[in-house]
Regions:
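Glycine-rich anion-binding loop/nest that anchors nucleotide
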Residues: 123-125
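Active-site environment of divalent metal-dependent phosphoester hydrolases
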Residues: 128-130, 155-156
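HKD-type phospholipase D/PLD-like phosphodiesterase module
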Residues: 1-115, 135, 141-190
Length: 190
C-alpha cells in the first residue's frame, strides 16, 4: 500500500494513530493556489480513472485549505472548525467552499439542488445519501431535467441508483473498465 511504502522512509507526515478514512484530495501551493477535485494522486487516478481536478489561484481559498490541512495535521478529525471563508469570489466566479463533516456539506448540496430551475447533471462514484436523492426526486417532479452518471461497480442495494431510475430519472452506469471517480453536481437556474 501507499502507507507501507511511506512508512519505510519514517517521515513525520506518516501518522500511526489514525482510524477511519481520510479522503481529502487537495494541495496548497505557496499559500495562494490550490488543486482539489476527485483525483487521487496515483497512476490509476491520473491515467485510467475518470476524475476532475480544479486548479484555482486564490489566497482566500488557500487560507481555507490551509486551515483544514492544519486541523488534519494536528489530529483534529471529524470535529474541526467551520470553514473560514465559505463564499469566495475569484474574478467573476463565486465559489462556495466547505469541508465535511463540520460544514454539513450535504445540506449545502441539497440547498443548491432545490434552487435548480431547468436541469441537474451529476457524476458520482458512490451515491448513498437519501436526502440528496430526495432533493433530486423532488426537482424531477417539478419537471427539472435530472441526469446522472454513476460508477457501475458502486451500484448496489445501498446506492440510490435504482431509486432514481425507477422514478424515471435518466441515470446511467459508467462504462470505464476502471473507475468513474468524478464527484460533481451541476444545477442550472435561468
Amino acid at each position: 500500500t501507499d502507507d507501507g511504502y511511506l512508512k519505510k522512509f519514517n517521515y513525520s507526515f506518516v501518522r500511526k494513530d489514525r482510524s477511519g478514512l481520510m479522503h481529502n484530495k487537495f494541495c496548497i501551493v505557496d499559500g495562494k493556489k490550490i488543486s482539489t477535485g476527485s483525483m487521487n494522486p496515483t497512476n490509476n487516478g491520473a491515467h485510467k480513472n475518470n476524475n476532475n481536478l480544479l486548479l484555482i489561484e486564490s489566497s482566500t481559498l488557500a487560507d481555507n485549505y490551509e486551515a483544514e490541512f492544519q486541523e488534519m495535521w494536528d489530529g483534529t478529525y471529524k470535529k474541526g472548525e467551520n470553514v473560514l471563508n465559505p463564499n469566495v469570489k475569484v474574478g467573476d466566479v463565486m465559489f462556495e467552499n466547505y469541508f465535511c463533516p463540520e460544514d454539513h456539506c450535504a445540506n449545502h448540496i441539497k440547498e443548491e439542488l432545490q434552487k435548480a430551475e431547468t436541469s441537474i447533471h451529476f457524476m458520482t462514484f458512490s451515491f448513498t445519501h437519501e436526502g440528496i436523492a430526495n432533493a433530486m426526486l423532488l426537482k424531477h417532479l417539478d419537471n427539472v431535467s435530472v441526469e446522472g452518471v454513476m460508477e457501475a461497480r458502486q451500484v448496489s442495494k445501498y446506492s440510490q441508483f435504482m431509486r432514481l431510475d425507477t422514478a424515471g430519472i435518466d441515470v446511467v452506469k459508467d462504462s470505464n473498465k476502471n473507475n468513474m471517480h468524478h464527484i460533481s453536481h451541476l444545477s442550472t437556474t435561468l
